[in-house]
Amino acid sequence: MDIPKQYLSLFILIIFITTKLSQADHKNDIPVPNDPSSTNSVFPTSKRTVEINNDLGNQLTLLYHCKSKDDDLGNRTLQPGESWSFSFGRQFFGRTLYFCSFSWPNESHSFDIYKDHRDSGGDNKCESDRCVWKIRRNGPCRFNDETKQFDLCYPWNKSLY
């Protein structure tokens, strides 16, 4: 039985893709439905994890809602000192953005919790593919791997109204 070369190439490609898919590892703290690093992606992307910690003080409960253009992670609550995290694959051209609204009694703010150009490049990028944030009343502060402190603090996003 003589197999044409074009079918042999196709067969090898199918075996390669099947092998890659079966070896893929995809674990999220919560599922992100449109995650480009999921097991059905042949082109791997670097995975990131964002951790959010309630550091409001005064026993304040933090209500928050995080999402991207494609993924809505839902409304959530963090008690004082609690943390929550989610993982995702970065977009191929480095345009990944996740933003969150945060509220507690008498206050409401929003912040871009993950911005590719801020968190994946430059001097203050997140190390080890993990961005850890403490949410404080005056703004979010990210862990700095150089100083080993939460001293990379940013202002809240400007309100649109």
UniProtKB/Swiss-Prot annotation:
It is found in: Secreted. One of its GO terms (cellular component) is extracellular region. Residues 1-24 form the signal peptide. The keyword NAD does not apply. InterPro entries: Self-incomp_S1 (IPR010264). Its main location: secreted. Pfam families: Self-incomp_S1. Glycans are attached at residues 75, 106, 157. One of its GO terms (biological process) is rejection of self pollen. Keywords: Glycoprotein, Secreted, Self-incompatibility, Signal. Belongs to the plant self-incompatibility (S1) protein family. This is S-protein homolog 2.
